[in-house]
């Protein structure tokens, strides 16, 4: 817990060649070390055009910046990776930024039932406004899998763990 192994692996393999040489360089050919594959702490970055979206010039950058990570992670996990089908039953574990975006993705995909699960009633309220058809506060629910299986009529077609918890990942698998 607390060790993003895939991120650490990516940081080691996406920017550094096996020889230890760096993949990127500046205009003068000097090697550049980058973080997260594209220099996220840099003022400028070189990216593939497929990774870019145009935003309105008057869009607040504090809000627009969220779209590139949390929003796209949750939304695209549902629409691009899982390809949730219309009429599906979806369970989203965690109603933070990534989870709320997954809920929106499920609603846009046409899911028949979108169940948001969290321990915070405020977040669950937000989930309802963003497309959740049902909410479950799992705080103190030792039988959450049973609760979700009953609510979904036997299990979900898709389940998304949006917290980063091994225990919740197991729960996600168990509600399918």
What do these predicted ranges mean?
Residues 1-2, 54-60:
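A glycine-/small-residue-rich N-terminal strand-loop-strand element
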Residues 1-51:
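Glycine-rich phosphate/adenylate-binding loop and adjacent beta-alpha elements
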Residues 26-41, 59-80, 93-101:
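A glycine-rich, Thr/Ser-enriched phosphate-binding loop motif common to dinucleotide/cofactor-binding enzymes
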Residues 58-61, 83-89, 154-155:
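Short helix-loop-beta connector
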Residues 92-95, 105-171:
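Adenosine-nucleotide cofactor-binding segment
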Residues 176:
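Helix-to-beta-strand junctions that scaffold the AdoMet/dcAdoMet cofactor pocket
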């Amino acid at each position: 817990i607390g060790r993003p192994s895939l991120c650490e692996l990516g940081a080691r393999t996406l920017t550094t060649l096996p020889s230890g040489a760096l993949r990127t360089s500046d205009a003068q050919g000097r090697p550049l070390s980058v973080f997260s594959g594209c220099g996220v702490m840099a003022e400028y970055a070189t990216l593939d055009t497929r990774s870019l979206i145009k935003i309105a010039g008057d869009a607040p950058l504090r809000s627009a910046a969220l779209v590139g990570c949390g929003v796209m992670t949750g939304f695209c996990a549902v629409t691009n990776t899982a390809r949730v089908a219309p009429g599906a039953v979806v369970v989203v574990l965690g109603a933070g930024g990534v989870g709320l975006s997954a809920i929106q993705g499920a609603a846009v995909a046409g899911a028949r039932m979108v169940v948001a699960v969290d321990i915070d009633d405020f977040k669950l309220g937000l989930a309802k406004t963003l497309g959740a058809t049902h909410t479950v506060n799992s705080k103190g629910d030792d039988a959450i899998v049973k609760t979700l299986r009953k609510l979904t009529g036997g299990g979900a077609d898709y389940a998304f763990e949006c917290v980063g918890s091994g225990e919740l990942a197991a729960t996600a698998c168990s509600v399918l």
